[in-house]
């Protein structure tokens, strides 16, 4: 609760670069966890679909009607991104073969055919569920740009649910949700995902009140 209150202060004070940096830092911490679990080949997320559980930590039971096609170019160095790496060999191949350091800069346009990326609004966070290992290399090297092809506004689920520091609950009834592809049908993939969900609420309220958006997709 204190963390969210402090984050709200950054938003209220119009500290857009600080807001962006905090969200990107948290996305990077998640990426680091996925990276290390994949590196040691010991990922153990039994009973749930790995990539769907990550995405559903933001979407919950949101209808596909809120999925909108788009073609948005975003710079990796400015954008919070979570890329769902799943194979340590492919991950290392990406790190060895891509990047300016390897004289092969990541080019989102060239890789667009293989990358599927979602922009989660109003959080301004990108989740990648295809082309994961190439995008992971771009995140590690902090370079290039990524093309987002689907934008999803989660404002509706923010009206219905909240994260209570362990699980998602219905705001009206205070009962935990029962949604397929969530951890134990009610929990965020990791605690950080739940925090990001509540940070999205802060950003939604600021947008509703005064049009506040910390990122630019134009």
What label would you give each PLM region?
Residues 1-125:
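Short alpha-helix boundary/capping and kink motifs at helix termini
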Residues 127-130:
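Short His-Asn-centered micro-motif
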Residues 132-146:
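Short active-site loop/helix that positions an aromatic residue
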Residues 147-210:
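Accessory, usually C-terminal, subdomains that scaffold auxiliary metal cofactors
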Residues 212-218:
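N-terminal accessory interaction module
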């Amino acid at each position: 609760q204190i963390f969210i209150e402090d984050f709200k202060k950054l938003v209220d004070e119009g500290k857009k670069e600080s807001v962006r940096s905090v969200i990107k830092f948290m996305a990077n911490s998640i990426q680091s966890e996925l990276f290390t679990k994949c590196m040691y080949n010991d990922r153990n997320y039994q009973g749930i679909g790995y990539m769907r559980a990550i995405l559903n930590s933001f979407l919950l039971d949101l209808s596909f009607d809120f999925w909108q096609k788009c073609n948005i170019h975003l710079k990796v160095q400015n954008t919070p991104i979570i890329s769902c790496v799943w194979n340590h060999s492919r991950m290392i191949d990406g790190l060895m073969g891509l990047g300016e350091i390897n004289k092969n800069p990541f080019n989102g346009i060239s890789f667009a055919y293989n990358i599927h990326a979602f922009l989660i609004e109003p959080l301004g966070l990108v989740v990648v569920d295809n082309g994961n290992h190439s995008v992971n290399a771009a995140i590690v090297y902090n370079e290039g740009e990524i093309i987002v092809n689907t934008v999803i506004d989660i404002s509706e689920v923010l009206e219905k649910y909240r994260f209570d520091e362990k699980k998602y609950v219905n705001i009206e009834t205070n009962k935990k949700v029962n949604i397929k592809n969530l951890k134990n049908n009610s929990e965020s993939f990791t605690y950080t995902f739940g925090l990001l969900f509540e940070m999205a609420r802060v950003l939604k309220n600021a947008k509703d009140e005064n049009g506040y958006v910390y990122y630019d997709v134009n």
